[in-house]
């Protein structure tokens, strides 16, 4: 890992480390050596939860404590942190042991998410709380811009699952239909299928999860459009059937 590549990561974080050793430790998985990032991850997790809680408190004045807690949980969960790692292109900076490298650990959401928290902890130790808060706010601004308080920050896959379960329909099926590019920068294409509604959506993503989320988002929009149309068609069919059944009675009355 070169100083130049670390400088690129620092630019993406918008923080220059006074102690470069902290940055290197934050990027080091336990499989790589004894000086790994788990303690930094523990610290970063606490700082992250506080900063996100403050952001939500200021942004959503009408949400109660329960909704704020659920929204925060969705924003700091593994999947959300892995998305931030993707934006930082963090996989190319990870320091992994040989076994983790061979098994594709640089793409594993749990490792990516833990490293993001470790980076937040490293910034806190390097320059204090305000620096860590600034870095976290910067990384969460794109996330917060798309948060719908009505759905409490749930991702597209969760919303699609709840939508289908609420209508007693089978859960969607996700299938990787194609991969492109080198191992460290693969692009995925994933199909989201809802057989009961005859919906099939294929979407790309920088990771399998990202592609699944993109496909689920479009599939949810399609399902929301299909079901009202299907209900309207059924109602229309029932109305025609009722009219047909009542027609002979009306004719008989006119004959009389």
UniProtKB/Swiss-Prot annotation:
Keywords: Cytoplasm, Endonuclease, Hydrolase, Magnesium, Metal-binding, mRNA processing, Nuclease, RNA-binding, rRNA processing, rRNA-binding, tRNA processing. The active site is at 45, 117. One of its GO terms (molecular function) is rRNA binding. InterPro entries: dsRBD_dom, RNase_III, RNase_III_dom, RNase_III_sf. It is found in: Cytoplasm. Residues 155-225 form the DRBM domain. One of its GO terms (cellular component) is cytoplasm. GO terms for biological process: mRNA processing; regulation of gene expression; rRNA processing; tRNA processing. Residues 6-128 form the RNase III domain. Its cofactor is Mg(2+). It catalyses: Endonucleolytic cleavage to 5'-phosphomonoester. Its EC number is 3.1.26.3. Its main location: cytoplasm. HAMAP family: RNase_III (MF_00104). Homodimer. Digests double-stranded RNA. Involved in the processing of primary rRNA transcript to yield the immediate precursors to the large and small rRNAs (23S and 16S). Processes some mRNAs, and tRNAs when they are encoded in the rRNA operon. Processes pre-crRNA and tracrRNA of type II CRISPR loci if present in the organism. Belongs to the ribonuclease III family. This is Ribonuclease 3. It comes from Bordetella pertussis (strain Tohama I / ATCC BAA-589 / NCTC 13251).
């Amino acid at each position: 890992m070169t100083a130049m590549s670390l400088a690129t990561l620092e630019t993406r974080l918008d923080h220059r480390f006074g102690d470069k050793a902290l940055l290197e430790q934050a990027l080091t998985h336990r499989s790589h050596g004894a000086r790994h990032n788990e303690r930094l991850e523990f610290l970063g997790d606490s700082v992250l939860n506080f900063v996100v809680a403050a952001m939500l408190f200021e942004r959503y004045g009408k949400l109660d404590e329960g909704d704020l807690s659920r929204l925060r949980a969705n924003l700091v969960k593994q999947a959300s942190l892995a998305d931030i790692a993707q934006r930082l292109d963090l996989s190319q900076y990870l320091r992994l042991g040989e076994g983790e490298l061979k098994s594709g650990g640089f793409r594993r959401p749990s490792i990516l998410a833990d490293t993001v928290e470790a980076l937040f902890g490293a910034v806190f130790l390097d320059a204090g709380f305000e620096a860590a808060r600034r870095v976290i706010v910067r990384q969460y601004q794109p996330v917060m811009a798309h948060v719908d308080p009505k759905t409490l920050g749930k991702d597209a896959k969760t919303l699609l699952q709840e939508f289908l379960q609420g209508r007693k329909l089978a859960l969607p099926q996700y299938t990787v239909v194609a991969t492109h590019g080198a191992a460290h920068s693969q692009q995925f294409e994933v199909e989201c299928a809802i057989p009961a509604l005859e919906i099939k959506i294929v979407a790309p993503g920088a990771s399998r999860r990202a592609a699944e989320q993109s496909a689920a988002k479009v599939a949810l929009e399609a399902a929301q459009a299909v079901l009202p149309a299907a209900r309207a068609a059924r109602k229309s069919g029932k109305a025609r059937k009722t009219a047909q059944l009542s027609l002979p009675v009306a004719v008989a009355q006119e004959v009389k």
